[in-house]
Amino acid sequence: MSSVEIRKVTDKKSLAAFIDFHYDLYKGSPYDAPNLYSDEVHTLSKDKNAAFEFCEAEYFMAYKDGKLVGRIAGIINKRANEKWERKSVRFGWVDFIDDIEVSRALFQAVEDWGRQKGMTEIVGPLGFTDMDPEGMLIEGFEELGTMATIYNYPYYPQHIEQLGGWEKDNDYLEFKLIVPQGGVPEKYQKIAEMVMKRYNLHPMHPKRSQVFGEEQIGRKVLNVVNKSFGHLYGYSQMTEAQIDEYLKMYFPMLDMNLICLIEDWNTPNHDIIGVGISITSMTRALQKCRRGRLWPFGWWHCIRALKFRKAECVDMMLVGILPEYQQKGANALLFYDLIPWYQKYGFKWGETNVEMETNNQVQSQWKYLDHQQHKRRRCSKKVIGDGC
């Protein structure tokens, strides 16, 4: 039996090989939503990703008979560890062929590195921050993936179980929501009208000039995300540098009609207290980008999806309400406002982002829609030492 050789990523060439392995392993998959190569380079580069202000990382590749057969990232998020009082080394960007010796060697590499850094547990899949994809798919392998989540083959969780020592740390659920026809469901409409009248909360759509201009609405939106997501599993607040980074990377591609903000008109400046961001599903377009590249023709597939709205699915990327408003029905305003836009754009169904299985408050907001819980993903953990 051939042995598995572990090599570290040390330069641009080896980083390119690390990134490209996913495209090779998932070539032809009808479910995977591959990331753009340029985005992966940005996220994984220490001189580009603002998360390296408080993170450190090491990337490992597995070779067998001279062939690349797996990859994994080891990440230590110091802010998250301090906040949650844990000594965790995260694993992410994990891919491997169906060979238990390969997966064993990859996880062992991160465990050893984490132990050297004084960590006591390994946990994942997680990224640098909560804005990166997280959780290993354990249900829903024949469902279409989204650009905000990880797709993996069914043998991945089987390897975790076979390797031993791992246990569940957190599960996420995802839902498929059928876009209703013939207007907004009556229940959403009644709640929304009550919320507007009783609490003076109102939906609005920002103009692109407001997002990036003097009003800095984009920054205000991400500040709402920081405050509303702060209690969630593994979350570490975005720094100002990260906010700048996300504004530049993601907001230019968003359709303002699919961004709904909730304002409190009781405040002098109509403060933003809630946000709902959706985007046309990019999965089919990303699958047509050869090895994640926009050139020569990948850009056309992405533009076509974004501008001509050829997809039947809308990805509901983010819903956040400030904690002090979460009991006032403010989330109903988001769907009261966005559902007519979904109908106008011809969307047939929506894909939610990941939701913690214990977050009953979030899951309850789908009860007035025809919905199906169709995916589950898991973060697992394993003790690797006592930190001494």
Where are these regions (language model features)?
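Acyltransferase donor/substrate-recognition loop-hinge adjacent to the catalytic core
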Residues: 3-4, 150-232
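Flexible loop/turn segments at secondary-structure boundaries
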Residues: 15, 68, 78-81, 130-132, ...
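Generic start-of-chain signal for non-secretory N-termini
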Residues: 1-31
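Catalytic cores of nucleotide-enabled group-transfer and carboxylate-activating enzymes in metabolic
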Residues: 12-14, 36-46, 53-62, 69, ...
